[in-house]
């Protein structure tokens, strides 16, 4: 996924943002340079690098995030997953780590996106919407104009210890499809995806991209067999998407 593909300044309601039979694949919770290259060699368009989170799997130290991001080749997006809600803190984090995409896992105060745009030109912004009910559709519609893409996940921000991703749970894909049909930016689908269900998810939602973490891991490590099976399953949808 070329870095500029999702940049808002050139965004249009175009075919590359429409439902796709060949969704991009983002492999998240990358733990090492070796895992990043394994994902890329299998066809990943993006790798996800998880910074400190209140809960969930996958966080790695910032120095390791920076090391991996520096070795991601051109044409592949390096996503920084952040739970920070202060725009200045997010800017500082990106400047330390030099990723080309920021995945914002929690809600931001009003005006934050403009601050990020001004401070980080050329860096793509992806907002996570945790699909908990019909209200998530309205939330996604309201935010879509501010960002380069929306990513749907299955966390819960209302808990005492927030869940901001990595739950391994699916959510209601009918709501995901409703969101995809209502917005004009690319939509990534996450939440409980694995080789056994990703083809069904793609057929149901028809997202721009799919995102997976725990569904490809054994004892926390990226499993090459599961990884290969996931890509085979996504490939199957190219001729079977309705």
Set out the residue ranges of the language-model regions:
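Conserved N-terminal beta1-alpha1 strand-loop-helix module at the mouth
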Residues: 2-209, 214-239
